[in-house]
């Protein structure tokens, strides 16, 4: 297996649901970070990019018909570059990076772009076809998040718990208290607010320019953060699934919009295209768990990856764990033997504060882990996340 390097990485700001990026189509949004990779890398012969891999979880609206291909064309990349859209739900963007890594490591490719996009604000309502000409049981499905067009066999065999219900299942099964969840959520908000104030995220963000009748709006900051959050305010929120449960809007991730893109290259491509390697991709691994506790999915994925690499979780200087819910984040950390407030975990906050645009988030985790390693001087970084329907994904990098 050959070395594979991440040579550049950029993302858009993360928009709040119905917020600043709500007017931007998913394909246009995906084109923003792709286009932003071109100017800083003038020596790259772009027509020699082997593939653009892009993750996207929905694909029911404007992100249909292979958004990766449409976005690369909209970004002005050569028509000769093929593009493919991957869907591993929440981990789609990370899977795109891992897929590019494997193709280059095997020798099949030399140069690729990988990333992800999601516009949850613009997720459409959809309706299936009638089973008869006079059917009256038509159902309109909201594609923003969660189940749709449920298979009766899936429901009877595994259940079709909503995402908040799976988070409460994890809280119950792994004994994660409401107090611990709220404290975890508060730390996420505080760390993200501090990082934003210090300009940490500005270095990984490309502004999104939105034209309108009165001129132009420039979106350049993540807008989901709530720096005014207090523990008192979090404790007052009502549980989503009933009074005896613990998951709330405050200790869960957001519904958001965003896109990210990274350049991956072999050692030969680095030299040929004048690229600067920033990190080496060490590997990626996935794991499966019961769908009702999908949030614990990172545990088998991380264990598989660390065993394969011959390292321990404690060897990672940065761990970017997607905060789908505080309950699952805490359960994962405890199962992996990591302290609730370990300084190497999400040092700049996580999805509870920053938001969780599904197809983008996995790429954002890898990008932010790389950025933090460069800032801190650390060597190894781990990005991991749970996945709907009971999966986990983990990817490791090493700064060079």
Swiss-Prot record:
Pfam families: Thiolase_C, Thiolase_N. The keyword Transferase applies. It catalyses: succinyl-CoA + acetyl-CoA = 3-oxoadipyl-CoA + CoA. Its EC number is 2.3.1.174. The active site is at 90 (acyl-thioester intermediate), 356 (proton acceptor), 386 (proton acceptor). GO terms for biological process: 3,4-dihydroxybenzoate catabolic process; beta-ketoadipate pathway. GO terms for molecular function: 3-oxoadipyl-CoA thiolase activity. CDD domains: thiolase. It is an enzyme of class 2 (transferase). Keywords: Acyltransferase, Aromatic hydrocarbons catabolism, Transferase. Pathway: Aromatic compound metabolism; beta-ketoadipate pathway; acetyl-CoA and succinyl-CoA from 3-oxoadipate: step 2/2. It comes from the Bacteria. InterPro entries: PcaF (IPR012793), Thiolase (IPR002155), Thiolase-like (IPR016039), Thiolase_acyl_enz_int_AS (IPR020615), Thiolase_AS (IPR020610), Thiolase_C (IPR020617), Thiolase_CS (IPR020613), Thiolase_N (IPR020616). The keyword Acyltransferase applies. Catalyzes thiolytic cleavage of beta-ketoadipyl-CoA to succinyl-CoA and acetyl-CoA. Belongs to the thiolase-like superfamily. Thiolase family. PANTHER family: ACETYL-COA ACETYLTRANSFERASE, CYTOSOLIC, ACETYL-COA C-ACYLTRANSFERASE. This is Beta-ketoadipyl-CoA thiolase.
